[in-house]
């Protein structure tokens, strides 16, 4: 499999850093509203890559973040009369349902507020 290298401007043969193991991090959603087609396109695209790598025999660790601390979240929660955590929990559940409907592969998610100092 070849991957486009933006630094060199060339397609390079994919070589994992660790034999037969691939770690993928994909920037996730900022959860202040429903999932839209742009989100779906991103996650379906990476879903295809994860499935391909697994079918090629790689062990894949797939991680996406969820941004649950953001000015847009604070504004939206005030508009709806909810706490920021109530708002983000609502949209995380909705997002997970949408991706379940799309039958995307499971992933590990990191919530931004859990990784802040």
Model-based region annotation:
Residues 1-75, 80-84, 110-111:
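N-terminal catalytic cores of NTP/NDP-binding nucleotidyl/phosphoryl-transfer enzymes
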